[in-house]
């Protein structure tokens, strides 16, 4: 092999090495940009999640808007997923990997909650054919057409009057008579409807989820009945 040939081979190898280092540098830059974008996207979504929770806590009206809870859970799910991807892409540290495992558990919990809420939404929508009920379900109380989401079946429904208006649990029902209100209780696929007036029994038997439940309905002037 001549000296010229060996010089040309070494030159080609040096060019190949510099080319590989150039592309390797580009890959490192793209990887860093990806990690940076993942981090800020997850931080942004978590900030929205915390903001929604704060608004629901201090402004209860926000929590009664349709699909707020489901959308907030979806935001938490996506933010957690992005954090998991970021942790497993960015680090080989075992401690960081363990932190990623905790995030995986949180993600699975979010998936379970999201699947449960979505399933109950479609079940309620199928049985009651009402988007308003399904969005606030699965347990919903309707008083004169106004729907209220409940965490559990109430033992009493208290309807008060003030300055010619009716109120249920602080919610304005408008101008109506507290002696005659239409109350509907939705729970899953069950629906119980009854009228509230002076001569109606104050203790009502309601069929909810296949079980007989006693529900007390009264106005301020009526004597309270223990359940």
UniProtKB/Swiss-Prot annotation:
Glycosylated residues (UniProt): 4
Membrane-spanning residues: 43-63, 67-87, 96-116
Keyword Glycoprotein belongs to the record: yes
GO CC terms: host cell Golgi membrane; membrane; viral envelope; virion membrane
Disulfide bonds: none
Superkingdom as given in the UniProt entry: Viruses
Keyword Glycoprotein tagged: yes
Topological region Virion surface: 1-42, 88-95
Main location: virion
Membrane topology: Multi-pass membrane protein
Keywords for the protein's UniProt record, in alphabetical order: Glycoprotein, Host Golgi apparatus, Host membrane, Membrane, Transmembrane, Transmembrane helix, Viral envelope protein, Viral matrix protein, Virion
Subcellular location: Virion membrane; Host Golgi apparatus membrane
Signal peptide boundaries: none
Similarity-based family: Belongs to the torovirinae M protein family.
Protein purpose: Component of the viral envelope that plays a central role in virus morphogenesis and assembly via its interactions with other viral proteins.
Subunit structure: Interacts with many viral proteins in infected cells. Interacts with envelope E protein in the budding compartment of the host cell, which is located between endoplasmic reticulum and the Golgi complex. Forms a complex with HE and S proteins. Interacts with nucleocapsid N protein. This interaction probably participates in the viral mRNA packaging into the virus.
The name this protein goes by in its record: Membrane protein
UniProt organism field: White bream virus (isolate Blicca bjoerkna L./Germany/DF24/00)
Gene responsible for this protein: M
């Amino acid at each position: 092999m001549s000296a010229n040939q060996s010089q040309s081979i070494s030159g080609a190898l040096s060019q190949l090495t510099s080319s590989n280092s150039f592309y390797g540098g580009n890959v490192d830059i793209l990887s860093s940009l990806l990690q940076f974008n993942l981090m800020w996207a997850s931080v942004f979504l978590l900030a929205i999640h915390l903001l929604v929770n704060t608004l629901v806590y201090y402004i209860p009206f926000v929590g009664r808007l349709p699909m707020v809870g489901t959308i907030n859970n979806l935001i938490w799910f996506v933010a957690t997923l992005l954090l998991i991807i970021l942790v497993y892409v960015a680090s080989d540290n075992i401690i960081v990997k363990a932190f990623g495992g905790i995030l995986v558990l949180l993600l699975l919990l979010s998936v379970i909650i999201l699947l449960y809420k979505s399933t109950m939404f479609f079940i309620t929508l199928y049985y009651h054919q009402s988007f308003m009920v399904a969005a606030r379900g699965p347990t919903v109380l309707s008083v004169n057409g106004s729907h209220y989401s409940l965490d559990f079946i109430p033992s009493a429904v208290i309807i008060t009057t003030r300055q010619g208006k009716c109120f249920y649990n602080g919610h304005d029902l408008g101008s109506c008579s507290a002696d005659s209100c239409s109350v509907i209780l939705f729970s899953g696929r069950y629906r119980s409807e009854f009228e509230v007036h002076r001569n109606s029994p104050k203790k009502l038997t309601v069929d909810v989820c296949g079980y007989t439940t006693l529900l007390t309905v009264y106005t301020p002037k009526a004597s309270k009945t223990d359940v």
